[in-house]
């Protein structure tokens, strides 16, 4: 359990770089920053079109295009679990015209699992700001005799064999959330990986696997219909979409905080004044009601803030997941 909170060498560097950029923003003017942008900005989404990451990107890109006076063009560049598109931004010119839709999987998990990721989240990127975060919901099939996290833990400890739980694949947040729960509570769980959320949900609804961590939009209808039973939210605070559902921390697992965090990042070396401008326009977009509502349909809550606040969240996620990935020996070649 201590491995999840173990200090990792160089862990403060990412935060230090972010803080330095904020300080510099107030002290220096960079050539070309005053009239930035003078041409379209490319926002790379490192996943195929159609997913929640693309929706997040388009929601903020439309608003930012209007306030920046130049188009923010969303370009999907998927492959290798998001590492191909992310790596391309790391190698892009640090001029503010190529930025990244960053995500928990690509910033905090993939580099720990994939020796060939080709980028270092701390060295190669500087944060612009967070877009929002989306919790998962711990759900069980109604046939499982557990109506709370405490009852689930008691059931799992008494079970003769590890309780199975599904996920859309090895190394996903859904997978690691289960491993994290097992590590924190001492219960034995058996991970059953699927090729995507669809097949996993099919087996969960059919009672072939008893539990799973699922996104809020997936959980909502099923929990309300009674086809699945929601036990807890994975984030530190409750969700406005399921306000009666307690958090795992409230349910006897102190400190449990697992979220999908979405944000914007730029290549390291991007002028601080450009970062400040992008942060300002991102926050303005997130303050609008229509963007908030669109994010809510994806199960996410808008969270405007500073670059250093986003850096701190990414750093905390990286510490948590890299420690767990190392402990479990998970690797993707």
Annotate each PLM feature.
Residues 38-40, 184, 224, 247-250, ...:
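An extracytoplasmic/periplasmic, membrane-proximal ligand-sensing/linker region
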Residues 106-116, 182-184, 211-245, 322:
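A ligand-binding cleft/hinge motif common to bilobed small-molecule-binding domains
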Residues 32-123, 162-164, 186-213, 222, ...:
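N-terminal (or domain-start) structured segment
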Residues 52, 56, 60, 64, ...:
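Stable alpha-helical elements in mature extracytoplasmic
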Residues 13-29:
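Bacterial N-terminal signal peptides
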Residues 91-97, 104, 112-199, 248, ...:
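Hinge/capping helix and adjacent helix->loop/strand transition within the periplasmic-binding protein
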Residues 1-11:
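N-terminal secretory signal peptides that target proteins for export/translocation
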